[in-house]
């Protein structure tokens, strides 16, 4: 049976893990929110507000190759139509539906409702010493008949580079949050 796990611990506060089985690819990153005192400090409340904005599809958080439109919304759940590179990832060309659920003030779970199964979990991780980490985990089902790897999908769409890894995306989103905090927008 195929099971590959690769763990990287960047510091005692951060970790990156990738696990692959024949059917699943799981990437997880836990990135320290306030690694030093020289940059704007981000509070748990600001992180929570940012998770909500990201989950709603706020364009400041969404990569340029993703298009999203809210079609249903309640306090704890949002359903959006999603296009990648201006196109559907589904064989019939219809927009993929994405459901985002909020669990309390520190966890956001997003999954695609058709086509190859994909789930992302973003959240706030509190360490025993009070430090905050931004957590992002992605799970892809590779054995779905319509599955295409993210890099192959980007190449097919004509993108000049592959989409970010889970760790790169976590750091990208955290950088956006820090910028919004510095500008007083969170």
Give, region by region, the residue ranges found by the protein language model:
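Beta-strand/loop substructures that line and gate deep hydrophobic ligand-binding cavities in soluble
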Residues: 111-172
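N-terminal mitochondrial targeting presequence
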Residues: 1-8
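Intrinsically disordered, low-complexity coil segments
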Residues: 17-20, 34-38, 86-104, 126-132, ...
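Intrinsic-disorder/low-complexity, polar/charged segments enriched in Ser/Thr/Lys/Arg/Asp/Glu/Gln
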Residues: 24-28, 77, 134
